Amino acid sequence: MNPGTITNREDFLQRIAKQLGREVKLTPPKREYTHRPQDEVLKGASEEELLETFRMVATRIHTDLVECESAKLDDTLRLLIERYHGARILAENDERISAWAPTTSETFDWWDSSQPEASRELAIRADIGITIADAAFAESATIVQYAMPGRSRTISLLPQDHIAIIPKSVLVPRMTQTAQQLATLDRDGLHSPNGVNFISGPSNSADIEMNLIVGVHGPVRVSYVLVHDL
């Protein structure tokens, strides 16, 4: 028997079932939750209430939050890049970025999924990584990024700073709504992402004395750019 393997499982279960006087049930029963507190968090909150919660929590997790309309996104990105003294910018390969910021994005490097090693080198040297959030949670000021070609986790992890563009339309109360969406994709046989990344501001670490250090395991600074009309 190889380590970590299970043998004779069916025979074992058959013996137990026989002693209990019933057949072996191979399909697990569907269990309904008696209580579903996850559905009650921010239930019935208005769009403005979700946004206000998101603003408040973003401050707690040491994240800059900038808000603008799509017409001002180009200038907003430029000013943020200047504030962070960014000279080398790496963006995920999403045509929406160049469409929303045609002038500022002219100097960006773009993630090339056909050349992952070269793209990783760009990420290592980049001052800022720019991505687009697929969802955002008001409860924890967490953003969600789906992993797929051209949209590597490396872009938001290796550069010194990270700027995430958040269309306001993707703001939801909490993780529950995104989990339900992903479950629907799997259940309906639709294409689901290769991976799901949850990002809650810059990386944090604390020692036994609770001295907080920001930016040890990832970006030193994270900025959310929330765009109201997207």
Curated annotation (Swiss-Prot):
GO terms for biological process: lactate metabolic process. Signal peptide: none annotated. SUPFAM superfamilies: NagB/RpiA/CoA transferase-like. Gene3D superfamilies: NagB/RpiA/CoA transferase-like. HAMAP family: LutC. Transmembrane segments: none annotated. The gene is lutC. Is involved in L-lactate degradation and allows cells to grow with lactate as the sole carbon source. Belongs to the LutC/YkgG family. InterPro entries: FTHF_cligase-like_sf, LUD_dom, LutC, NagB/RpiA_transferase-like. This is Lactate utilization protein C.
